[in-house]
Design a protein with these regions (language model features):
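Feature responds to low-complexity, polar/acidic, surface-exposed segments characteristic
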Residues: 2-32, 43-62, 66-94, 103-168, ...
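Surface-exposed binding/hinge segments that line
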Residues: 176
Length: 186
């Protein structure tokens, strides 16, 4: 009987901690997304839903970082001209992707494609944020571990459960971007 009671108490303790952790992450996501909405970095879908649980594409993330950097309102004539085989001038995110690539924050794949409709992974998004913060491709180690380690070191992933090849959600991106805003640029 005592052993059963002890196991029940342990189980309740573990369940309450898991529930608290989920609630805590959801709060960080909501707070971060609210900041991004106020700054004009994150836009909702029709009806106002932010879709924080939805995966985010590479094109959507490029658009967010260009807004974050303030280039949306400035004239921009990137040199050298960067182009990707799968990104036409008619694509809705053509300019943000081109700007981010010209600035050196975004790189395409070895087949010279950008794959704008692919979901962005933790490794890809974190690499871009680390580059924006002033760290270049000369980080020690191999990609993506070198960027993931630098991100952890500078504190931009402290509120994320990073899974390298997993697609990020809009909520996760909000947390990453807001946590990056608190880091001094190199």
């Amino acid at each position: 009987m005592r052993k059963s009671l002890f196991l029940v108490i342990i189980a309740l303790f573990l369940i309450s901690n898991v529930a608290f952790a989920e609630t805590s992450h959801e709060k960080v996501e909501k707070d971060s997304s609210a900041i991004m909405v106020r700054l004009g970095l994150l836009k909702g879908y029709q009806g106002g839903d932010l879709g924080l649980e939805k995966k985010i594409t590479r094109a959507e993330f490029a658009t967010i970082i260009i807004r974050m950097l303030g280039y949306q309102a400035k004239p921009f004539n990137p040199k050298p001209k960067i182009s990707f085989k799968d990104l036409s001038k008619k694509h809705w995110a053509y300019m943000p992707v081109r700007m981010a690539a010209s600035l050196g924050y975004i790189k395409g794949y070895s087949d010279k494609k950008f794959k704008p409709s692919n979901n962005i992974t933790y490794s890809e998004a974190i690499t871009i944020m680390v580059r924006i913060l002033g760290y270049d491709d000369k980080l020690e180690g191999k990609w993506p571990d070198n960027y993931l380690n630098k991100a952890k070191e500078i504190g931009i992933t402290k509120n994320l459960d990073v899974v390298s090849k997993k697609a990020m959600t809009r909520g996760d991106i909000a947390v990453l971007v807001v946590d990056s805003m608190g880091v001094e640029m190199k």
